[in-house]
Amino acid sequence: MVKRVQLVLTKDVSKLGRSGDLVDVAPGYARNYLIPQSLATHATPGILKQVERRREQERQRQLELRQQALEQKESLEKVGSLKIAKQVGENEAIFGTVTSQDVADAIQAATSQEVDRRGITIPDIGKLGTYKAEIKLFSDVTAQIDIEVVAS
């Protein structure tokens, strides 16, 4: 029978777990590596209560963020179409391309809402016309918005 020690991780440890996880490890691993490196502490009843309280707070925070994302999605989809003006060459081909930063700036101007440009997915836009952009607001909340590229 192998003895195991219960620890609560204080930092992320590769191949073991994330900060706040309750893990069972060999006593030598705990005594010689995890505890001296301040990567974990012994799982006492008080620490387990703290961990549970932190998890509940994180759960509540995630629910609030998701609710805010849903509200932001509704307001973004009410906007309809965003107009982005670009210089045009022959055959309605635009100079450069429309970037996610351009879309984020257009959203900021139209709705005064900050949107992270890294969450915006747009197709390759090289000509004038109407395109669909997908904006990821939360892990499972995505808004669709029309982008109209017009000549400046």
Swiss-Prot record:
GO biological process, one term: translation
Gene behind this protein: rplI
Organism: Nostoc sp. (strain PCC 7120 / SAG 25.82 / UTEX 2576)
Keywords: Ribonucleoprotein, Ribosomal protein, RNA-binding, rRNA-binding
Lineage: Bacteria, Bacillati, Cyanobacteriota, Cyanophyceae, Nostocales
Function: Binds to the 23S rRNA.
Cellular component per GO, a single term: ribonucleoprotein complex
MF annotations from Gene Ontology: rRNA binding; structural constituent of ribosome
Family statement: Belongs to the bacterial ribosomal protein bL9 family.
Family annotation (PROSITE patterns): RIBOSOMAL_L9 (PS00651)
Name this polypeptide is given: Large ribosomal subunit protein bL9
